[in-house]
Amino acid sequence: MARAEVVVGAERLPEYLPLLRDSRVALLSNHTGLVNGGKEHTLDMLLRNGVNVTAIFSPEHGFRGDADAGSHVKNSVDAKTGIPIASLYNGKDSSPSPETMDRFDVILCDLQDVGVRYYTYYVTMMKLMDAAARSGKRFIVLDRPNPIAMMVDGPVLDMSLKSGVGALPVPVAHGMTLGELALMINGECWLPSATVCYTH
C-alpha cells in the first residue's frame, strides 16, 4: 500500500512565489518551519529562490527555537542571515513597531501548530494579522497539518478569561490548522482592531 506524502504549504513554491514578486517579505516562523524532509528551514529555501526577505518575526521560543517555554524573547538579528528579528513574545505589548512594519510589503506565516487553544502560536499569528490589517499588508499562511485534526474536544473559552494562552472562543482542541483559524478569525471579525486582514 502506497504511503501518502504531505506537502506542507511552504513547499508549494509555484503557488505562492508569484504573490511575492517585486515584494519585500517578512517571515513569521521558528524552528518548526522546516521543509525538504526537515533538511532545510523555510527561510533558507526562500532566500535560495530569490525571495527578498527583509524582516523576521519570532513567536514563543524564538526564531531558532533556543528560548525556554514562557521566556521573554528579545529583538535580535539572525546570526546566519543578518536579517533583523522582531520578537512578538517579549513580555510587553509585543505588537510590531511602525518602523518594523515599514520594512516589508507581505507577511509569510510558517509555523507548526498542535491544534490546542492554550498553544501560543495562533495568538501570535492573530496579533500580526491585526497589525497587517491596520497597515494594509498582505498576509499569507503557509499551512501545515494539525496533528490532532480529528479531535475537537473541551469547552469553548469564556472570553472573560481571555489571555495569551487563550484568546479565541474555540474549544480546547479546536480541530483547525493555522490557515483555517486565520480564515475563521477574519470571517468572525475577531481581530482586535475589528478590521479584516487581506489573507491568502
Language model features with spans:
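N-terminal phosphate-binding or glycine-rich loops at protein starts, especially the Walker A/P-loop
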Residues: 5-51
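A short helix->loop->beta-strand "cap" motif at the edges of active sites that frequently abuts
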Residues: 50-51, 132-138
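Short internal beta-strands
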Residues: 52-61, 142
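Glycine-rich, charge-decorated loop segments at or immediately adjacent to ligand/cofactor-binding or catalytic sites
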Residues: 65-69, 140-162
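Glycine-rich oxoanion-binding loops at beta->alpha junctions
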Residues: 73-104, 116
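Glycine/threonine-rich flexible loop motifs
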Residues: 113-125
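Acidic, His- and aromatic-enriched active-site or binding-groove loops in soluble protein domains
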Residues: 159-179
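Conserved small/polar residues in nucleotide/adenosyl-binding loops
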Residues: 199-200
